[in-house]
């Protein structure tokens, strides 16, 4: 990577260290975000996998809802993986209701591929990638439907598992658990090409 960006990893619960380590390997500057001031001077934000309900409660407790909304409205890039996908969605369906950030016009089926025992790995085809991608699904959700302006990036068994809308990218799997950095590189490209980007 030619450019090194300050990228926040929401550090409330879930796969925090895995994302931090992956970003370091890509010569980026990870910042663990636990309070609103941690968002200052960031070029992008990752909302990692974990337990979406637990992460949401901590977002509220740490008064991060509006700061994350403002971050997105400024045009800064956000990447949500697994639970992060759920939290960024407009609507969720499933047994338990989960409040969300409503930053992407998608409807998500929580734990759509099953619970922990149903975790699996699969080869998928993704837009903008010449070769197949090996994806790790852990209690993975999937996208039931997308609104206008949402670009489908990848599907598995006719279920949408990666998508983008403007400055928000999501995937149902865990890119930080593989050696294939193409989804993270897609996110870094979004940061680099952001018209509002002013690197400090």
UniProtKB/Swiss-Prot annotation:
Q: Which cysteines are joined by disulfide bonds?
A: none
One matching Pfam family:
SNO
Q: In which pathway does it act?
A: Cofactor biosynthesis; pyridoxal 5'-phosphate biosynthesis
Biological process annotations from GO: glutamine catabolic process; pyridoxal phosphate biosynthetic process; pyridoxine metabolic process
Q: Is Hydrolase there in the keyword field?
A: yes
By its UniProt entry, which SUPFAM superfamilies does this protein fall under?
Class I glutamine amidotransferase-like
GO CC terms: cytosol; glutaminase complex
Molecular function (GO) terms for this protein are: glutaminase activity; pyridoxal 5'-phosphate synthase (glutamine hydrolysing) activity
> What NCBIfam families does the database record attribute to this sequence?
PLP_synth_Pdx2 (TIGR03800)
Q: What is the protein's quaternary organization?
A: In the presence of PdxS, forms a dodecamer of heterodimers. Only shows activity in the heterodimer.
Q: What is this protein called?
A: Pyridoxal 5'-phosphate synthase subunit PdxT
Q: Which gene encodes it?
A: pdxT
């Amino acid at each position: 990577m030619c450019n090194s960006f300050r990228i926040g990893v929401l550090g409330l619960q879930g796969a925090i260290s895995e994302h931090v380590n992956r970003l370091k390997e890509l010569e980026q500057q990870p910042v663990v975000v636990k309070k609103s001031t941690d968002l200052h001077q960031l070029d992008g934000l990752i909302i990692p996998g974990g337990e979406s309900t637990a992460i949401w409660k901590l977002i509220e407790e740490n008064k991060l809802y509006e700061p994350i909304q403002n971050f997105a409205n400024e045009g800064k890039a956000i990447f949500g993986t697994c639970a992060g996908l759920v939290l960024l969605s407009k609507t969720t369906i499933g047994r338990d209701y989960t409040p969300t950030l409503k930053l992407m016009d998608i409807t998500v089926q929580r734990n759509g591929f099953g619970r922990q025992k149903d975790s699996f790995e699969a080869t998928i085809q993704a837009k903008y990638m010449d070769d197949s991608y090996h994806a790790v699904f852990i209690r993975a959700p999937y996208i039931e439907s997308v609104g206008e302006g949402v670009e489908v990036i990848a599907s598995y068994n006719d279920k949408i598992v990666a998508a983008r809308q403007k400055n928000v990218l999501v995937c149902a799997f865990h890119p930080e658990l593989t050696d294939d950095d193409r989804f993270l590189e897609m996110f870094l490209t979004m940061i680099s090409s952001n018209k509002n980007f002013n690197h400090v």
